[in-house]
From Swiss-Prot:
Protein's name according to its UniProt entry: BURP domain-containing protein 7
Keyword terms: Signal
Leader sequence segment: 1-21
Record lineage: Eukaryota, Viridiplantae, Streptophyta, Embryophyta, Tracheophyta
Name of the gene this protein is made from: BURP7
Region span, Disordered: 112-181
Bias-annotated ranges (Basic residues): 128-143, 170-181
Organism: Oryza sativa subsp. japonica (Rice)
Tissue expression profile of the protein: Expressed in roots, stems, leaves and shoot.
Compositional bias segments (type: Low complexity): 144-157
Positions of the BURP domain: 65-181
Length: 181
């Protein structure tokens, strides 16, 4: 009885010791880089059975990506998508609406946003174009050949697509399509 118990114990120890044997890749790592330990990510790639106990359902890489050998007609794969967390906005809506957006009120803006005057952030904020948004868009229109000719009063407020664009031919290079009365 004692002999069979000892043999069984020896068999269990041999089986447990065999599962922790170093793979050829681990042996090569020890020979090539004897002073540096193998990173866990590489060890998990080499021996995925050792990392099976530590895998969790939250592991999105393992749940979304799969191996090519698993892709064949009729195979069923389970994908777990975690719910995306809503990121925090820069400022709450009420506070963002209360910030005055005028260059003459720059000191008030800096104080509301807790930006010290003279800091690089304050300098960047004061270096913005000093024109109003309406003046900027008008300047953009005047410099663009698209807006170079004024629209006649009889023209509709919205553009109608050219027949060439509606047939799917699209815009040719070097030729702009515009509004038509």
């Amino acid at each position: 009885m004692a002999r069979s118990l000892a043999a069984l114990l020896l068999l269990l120890v041999a089986a447990a010791g065999d599962s922790h044997a170093a793979s050829p890749a681990e042996m090569y790592w020890k020979i090539a880089l004897p002073t540096s330990p193998m990173p866990g990510a590489i060890r998990d790639l080499i021996n995925p059975a050792s990392s099976a106990g530590s895998a969790s359902k939250e592991d999105t890489v393992g749940n979304v990506f799969f191996l090519e050998k698993d892709l064949f007609p009729g195979s069923k794969l389970t994908l777990h998508f975690t719910r995306a967390t809503a990121g925090a906005a820069l400022l709450p809506r009420g506070r963002a609406d209360s910030v005055p957006l005028a260059t003459e009120k720059l000191p008030e803006i800096l104080s509301q946003l807790s930006v010290p005057a003279g800091s690089p952030a304050a300098d960047a904020m004061s270096a913005r174009p000093r024109r109003s948004p309406a003046r900027r868009s008008n300047a953009r229109r005047r410099s663009s050949p698209w807006w170079s000719s004024p629209r006649p009063a009889s023209a509709p407020a919205t553009c109608t697509p050219c027949p060439r664009r509606s047939t799917g031919q699209g815009r040719r290079r070097g030729r702009r399509t515009g509004w038509r009365p």
